UniProtKB/Swiss-Prot annotation:
A motif (AHA) lies at residues 349-358. Homotrimer. A motif (Nuclear localization signal) lies at residues 290-293. This is Heat stress transcription factor A-6a. It comes from Oryza sativa subsp. japonica. GO terms for molecular function: DNA-binding transcription factor activity; sequence-specific DNA binding.
Length: 402
C-alpha cells in the first residue's frame, strides 16, 4: 500500500515542476499542513520574564469520502433504497374489482355494503340486475352463478340465508390495503390426483375397485327386476282397464235397450205380442204341456200371477190342519209358482236375444205396421190387459238398477 507523499518529497522527486505547481502545492499545503502555533509561558524564575515559545503540531484526519489526489472534496450521497411495498404482491384482480363494484355509489341499488354501517359484509339486492348491467362493467361475463362460485373460491361465506349477503375477514369498507390478504383457495395435490383418477376411470369406463364392479352388477340386477315387475303391473292394469271399458259399454248398451223396450211397449201395445210371436217361431213349443201353459197365460193375462201366488198361499194355510200332513196340497202349491217364474225368466232371456237380433229399421217398420192396423178409438175407455204382466218383466231386470 502506497503512502501519501508530502509536498517536500514531491518536490524532490520532480524538481523541474516545482515552479509550475507552486501555487497549487502551496494551497494544498495550507489546507493539509497546519500552521505552527506558539505558546508563551511566563516563568517567574527567569530574568526579565523571558518567554519561551514551543511549536505545537495539529493533526487533521481526512473525513470519509475525501481524497488525497487533489480532486473535488464532495460528500458521497447514500445508496438508493427500494420503494415501500415494491416487492409485495397486490390483491387479486377479482377481489379488487369486487371491492370497486361494492364501493361504487352508483350501484348501491343493486349491490352495496351491508346494513348497519359496519362495512364487514356486502349485499346483492338484485341478482338479475347485477348480472344484466353491473357484472359486464367489471368482469368479462354476466353470470351471477359464476360470480358466487368465485366468491366461494376466495373464501367469502354467505352470512344470511334469506338474502345474498357475503363477508370476508379482510374485505372491509375503507380498508383497501387488507385486500392483499385474501388469497385464492388451493386444492391439495392428493385430492387433485384422486379427482383426475376418477375422471379418467369414468372416461375410459373402468371402475376403481373390484368391489365397485360387484355393487354395480347387483344394482343392475335389482333395477332389471324392478323394471320387469313394473311391466307386469302395467300389463295387468291395462287388461283390467280394457275389461272395465267393455263392461261399461255392455251396461250402457243394456240400458239403452231397456229404455227402448219400455218406450216401445208404452207406445205400441202390440209390440209385446210381436216379440212373443218371434219367440215362438224361433224356439218353438217344447211339448204340449208347455204350449198349454203359454196359451193359458195369454188367455188369462188379466189375472196377476202375484195375486195367484197370494191366493195359493192363503189356500195352503187354510187347508193344512195341525193333525194332517197335507203333503199333496203343499207340493202342488209350491211347484206351480216355481214353474211360472222359470218360464218367465226363460222368456225374458229370449226377449233380450230378440232385442239384440232385431235391427232398428225392422223394429220401426213393425211399429208402423202395428200402429196402422189398429184404430185409436178401440183403445179409448178400455183398460190395457198387459199392464198387470209388467212386474214379471221388471223383476228379472232389477240388476239394471243396481
Amino acid at each position: 500500500m502506497l503512502k501519501p507523499q508530502t509536498p517536500r518529497a514531491r518536490r524532490a522527486a520532480h524538481p523541474n515542476s516545482h515552479m509550475a505547481s507552486s501555487s497549487s502545492s502551496s494551497s494544498l499545503c495550507r489546507l493539509l499542513i497546519p500552521r505552527p502555533t506558539t505558546r508563551r509561558f511566563s516563568g517567574g524564575g527567569g530574568e526579565g520574564g523571558m518567554a519561551a515559545a514551543a511549536p505545537v503540531k495539529r493533526e487533521v484526519k481526512p473525513e470519509a469520502g475525501e481524497g488525497w489526489g487533489g480532486g473535488d472534496l464532495g460528500v458521497v450521497p447514500p445508496p438508493p433504497r427500494p420503494m415501500e411495498g415494491l416487492g409485495e404482491a397486490g390483491p387479486a384482480p377479482f377481489v379488487a374489482k369486487t371491492y370497486e363494484m361494492v364501493a361504487d355509489a352508483a350501484t348501491d341499488a343493486v349491490v352495496s355494503w351491508g346494513p348497519g354501517g359496519s362495512g364487514a359484509s356486502f349485499v346483492v339486492w338484485d341478482p338479475h340486475a347485477l348480472a344484466a348491467g353491473v357484472l359486464p362493467r367489471f368482469f368479462k361475463h354476466a353470470n351471477f352463478s359464476s360470480f358466487v362460485r368465485q366468491l366461494n373460491t376466495y373464501g367469502f361465506r354467505k352470512v344470511t340465508p334469506d338474502r345474498w349477503e357475503f363477508a370476508n375477514e379482510a374485505f372491509l369498507a375503507g380498508q383497501k390495503h387488507l385486500l392483499k390478504n385474501i388469497k385464492r383457495r388451493r386444492v391439495s395435490k392428493p385430492l387433485v390426483d384422486s379427482q383426475l383418477r376418477n375422471k379418467a376411470s369414468v372416461v375410459f369406463g373402468q371402475p376403481e375397485a373390484p368391489g365397485e364392479v360387484v355393487s354395480l352388477k347387483r344394482d343392475r340386477a335389482a333395477l332389471r327386476a324392478e323394471v320387469i315387475m313394473l311391466k307386469q303391473q302395467y300389463n295387468a292394469c291395462k287388461s283390467q282397464l280394457i275389461a272395465m271399458e267393455e263392461m261399461v259399454r255392455n251396461i250402457e248398451r243394456r240400458q239403452q235397450q231397456t229404455i227402448g223396450f219400455f218406450a216401445k211397449v208404452l207406445t205400441n201395445p202390440a209390440f209385446v205380442q210381436q216379440v212373443l210371436l218371434n219367440y215362438v217361431n224361433k224356439n218353438g213349443l217344447r211339448g204340449a204341456a208347455k204350449r198349454q201353459r203359454l196359451m193359458e197365460n195369454e188367455e188369462q193375462h188379466a189375472d196377476s200371477p202375484l195375486n195367484k201366488g197370494m191366493e195359493a198361499a192363503s189356500v195352503m194355510e187354510a187347508d193344512v190342519s195341525p193333525g194332517s200332513t197335507g203333503c199333496g196340497t203343499v207340493g202342488k202349491v209350491e211347484t206351480t209358482p216355481m214353474c211360472n217364474f222359470q218360464n218367465i225368466e226363460n222368456m225374458c232371456d229370449d226377449v233380450w236375444e230378440e232385442l239384440d237380433a232385431l235391427p232398428e229399421t225392422g223394429m220401426e217398420q213393425e211399429e208402423k205396421a202395428g200402429i196402422g192396423s189398429f184404430d185409436v178409438e178401440e183403445f179409448v175407455g178400455r183398460p190395457c190387459g198387459w199392464v198387470d204382466d209388467c212386474p214379471y218383466l221388471v223383476e228379472p231386470m232389477q240388476f239394471v238398477e243396481h
